[in-house]
Amino acid sequence: MATQTIEGSSRSGPRRTIVGDLLKPLNSEYGKVAPGWGTTPLMGVAMALFAVFLSIILEIYNSSVLLDGISLS
């Protein structure tokens, strides 16, 4: 048998900690979904702004567009 229980073993339930007690209310909404689109448009805007940010960083790194007229030395 792969698993075996030992008779008379004292195994208590999960330990209660201060951090666990503080974080418990945050997990009380688990599984509940807000009706409609919720914050999806906000996430879309955030993703678009992040894509613009990454493209600006890439352009600076490649010295392709933003730094054409600037000498670095």
UniProtKB/Swiss-Prot annotation:
Coiled coil: none annotated. Keywords: Chloroplast, Membrane, Phosphoprotein, Photosynthesis, Photosystem II, Plastid, Thylakoid, Transmembrane, Transmembrane helix. It is a single-pass membrane protein. Signal peptide: none annotated. One of its GO terms (cellular component) is photosystem II. Gene3D superfamilies: Photosystem II reaction center protein H. Phosphorylation is a light-dependent reaction catalyzed by a membrane-bound kinase; phosphorylation occurs on Thr residue(s) in the N-terminus of the protein. The modification Phosphothreonine is found at T3, T5. One of its GO terms (biological process) is photosynthesis. The chain crosses the membrane at residues 41-61. PSII is composed of 1 copy each of membrane proteins PsbA, PsbB, PsbC, PsbD, PsbE, PsbF, PsbH, PsbI, PsbJ, PsbK, PsbL, PsbM, PsbT, PsbX, PsbY, PsbZ, Psb30/Ycf12, at least 3 peripheral proteins of the oxygen-evolving complex and a large number of cofactors. It forms dimeric complexes. Belongs to the PsbH family. One of the components of the core complex of photosystem II (PSII), required for its stability and/or assembly. PSII is a light-driven water:plastoquinone oxidoreductase that uses light energy to abstract electrons from H(2)O, generating O(2) and a proton gradient subsequently used for ATP formation. It consists of a core antenna complex that captures photons, and an electron transfer chain that converts photonic excitation into a charge separation. This is Photosystem II reaction center protein H.
